[in-house]
Regions:
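Conserved alpha/beta-hydrolase catalytic His-Asp/Glu region
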Residues: 129-130, 134-138, 149-211
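Flexible "cap/lid" loop of the alpha/beta hydrolase fold
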Residues: 104, 108-109, 113-153
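Conserved acidic catalytic loop of the alpha/beta-hydrolase fold
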Residues: 73-91
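Glycine-rich nucleophile elbow surrounding the catalytic serine of serine-hydrolase chemistry
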Residues: 95-105
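Conserved alpha/beta-hydrolase "nucleophile elbow" surrounding the catalytic nucleophile
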Residues: 27-29, 91, 95-97
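Conserved HGGG/HGGXW glycine-rich cap/lid loop of the alpha/beta-hydrolase fold
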Residues: 7-68
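Conserved loop-alpha-helix segment in the C-terminal half of the alpha/beta-hydrolase fold
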Residues: 212-252
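Catalytic active-site module of serine/aspartate enzymes centered on a nucleophile-bearing elbow/loop
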Residues: 242-274
């Protein structure tokens, strides 16, 4: 197990090897770096240096609880620490779901000096918030508070329901029950306080980072995503980022890197090879 320390928080990461360009895979909520198990072997076999890590409060990373903030500036500082610790250059960042927020915020606050390209996979940018300023958003303040309260009251029940929605499109579960249970097991590793606080971070506005982006960008999203709707996120990100490519996975739920792993991995490899 490899770790780095950012401030007082230990961040667990895995450097899976490979001599080619670095590819950093950033996991979704409430999972861990192990959620990329369908992609890591293929990327490594293609010659890339594949790096995964666990967000603070999740997986095997440190769980500072109330001693830490879980806003995206803090979370992105962990990504920046990883990039610096491993001296990753000419790297591709692949952010799934919540991980797309770190990608956009990294570009916004750190820049693109170390980057070759980026991928937003079923990702939260540009902005999920629904209010007077964002009337077409997906989540109101009441929605956020409601989810936080439900999770805090009964984490196992919340994660059971969430993973069903995570992997469903059109009312149909698109993965095996074993695959869903694997996701529940990863979610169970999360610190509940961190998981609750991260829900509030989902609705941060990432438009600034998207507008600054100049590196090649792939947006891949399922058209049946009931967690982060394509119309609110993927389509808009592709419109905001100049020259971005949009790949829509037909009948794809939120967890497309599992449900449609072959299509997802193929699209990712094709993009990275350019």
């Amino acid at each position: 197990m490899s770790t780095l320390t950012n401030g007082s928080v230990e961040i667990h990461y895995e450097d899976h090897g490979g001599d080619g360009r670095p590819v950093v895979l950033i996991h979704g909520w409430p999972l861990s770096g192990k959620s990329w198990s369908n992609q890591v072997p293929a990327l490594r076999d293609a010659g890339y240096r594949v790096v995964t890590y666990d967000r603070r409060g999740f997986g095997e990373s440190g769980k500072p609880g109330e001693a830490s903030s879980y806003d995206y500036d803090t979370l992105t500082s962990d990504l920046d620490a990883l990039m610096t610790e491993l001296d990753l250059r000419d790297a591709s960042l692949v952010g799934f779901s919540m991980g797309g927020g770190e990608v956009a915020r990294y570009i916004d606050t750190v820049g693109e000096e170390r980057l070759h390209s980026v991928v937003y996979a079923a990702a939260v940018p540009p902005c999920l918030k629904k209010d007077d300023e964002h009337p077409d958003g997906a989540l109101t303040d009441d929605d956020v508070r409601g989810m936080q309260e439900q999770l805090a009251q009964d984490p196992p029940a919340f994660f059971d329901d969430f993973t069903t929605n995570f992997f469903s499109a059109g009312g149909e579960l698109k993965v095996t029950e074993d695959e869903r249970q694997e996701a529940i097991a990863l979610a169970a590793q999360a610190d509940v306080h961190a998981a609750v606080q991260c829900i509030a971070s989902w609705v941060e506005d990432f438009t600034g980072g998207l507008r600054k982006s100049t590196v090649p960008t792939l947006v891949i999203h399922g058209d049946g995503d009931g967690i982060v709707p394509l119309e609110v996120s993927g389509q808009r990100t592709a419109q905001v980022v100049d020259g971005a490519e949009l790949h829509v996975v037909s009948d794809g739920p939120h967890g497309i890197n599992v449900s449609h792993k072959d299509e997802f991995t193929s699209a990712l490899l094709e993009f990275l090879a350019r």
